[in-house]
């Protein structure tokens, strides 16, 4: 059950890495790693508020202050300026940036338990626009496909994903 949520495909060079919003440092760290490995010359990040450790900022502001884990030069980062209330909206905003920049391919970084729904969502938005996306589950994440039910936080996340999958299907967002 935990394995199904994790989507993996071989990584290949792309036009950009997209790091999805969320309060997981592993996403931004892995996005930076993929950039540093030369898999993409640009990184798209969300500019959502940071709601962890009592911070009142955004990921982009933290990056500019040198406090973010995204070790990527500022000129290689594009921030989604619109507020995204869902993975579907992040996909739409990312698609718009990619069209504007003339890009065609992306590597999608998110937590492992989120990759299945995120990939289906992004493909539903990207494919009609002629764009491609490859999933990249964030390395270093504490999510484990076995024994997830033993940890209340992980258990809640898995259950939430299994609720969101049919919801997104019904809403035609995947």
Question: What is the predicted function of each stretch?
Answer:
Residues 151-174:
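A transmembrane-helix-recognition feature enriched in membrane-embedded lipid enzymes
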Residues 2-150:
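A structural signal for short, hydrophobic/glycine-enriched beta-strand patches
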């Amino acid at each position: 059950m935990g394995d199904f949520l994790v989507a993996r495909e071989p990584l290949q060079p792309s036009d950009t890495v997209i790091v999805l919003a969320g309060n997981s440092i592993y996403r931004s760290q892995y996005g930076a790693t993929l950039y540093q490995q030369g898999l993409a010359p640009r990184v798209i990040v969300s500019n959502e508020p940071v709601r962890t450790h009592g911070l009142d900022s955004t990921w982009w502001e933290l990056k500019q202050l040198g406090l973010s884990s995204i070790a990527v030069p500022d000129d290689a980062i594009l921030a989604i300026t619109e507020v995204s209330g869902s993975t579907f909206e992040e996909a739409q905003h990312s698609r718009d940036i990619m069209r504007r920049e003339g890009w065609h391919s992306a590597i999608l970084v998110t937590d492992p338990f989120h990759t299945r729904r995120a990939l289906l969502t992004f493909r539903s938005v990207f494919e009609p626009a002629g764009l491609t996306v490859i999933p990249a589950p964030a390395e270093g994440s504490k999510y484990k496909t076995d024994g997830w039910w033993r940890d209340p936080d992980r258990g809640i996340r898995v259950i939430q994903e299994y609720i969101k999958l049919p919801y997104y299907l019904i809403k035609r967002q995947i």
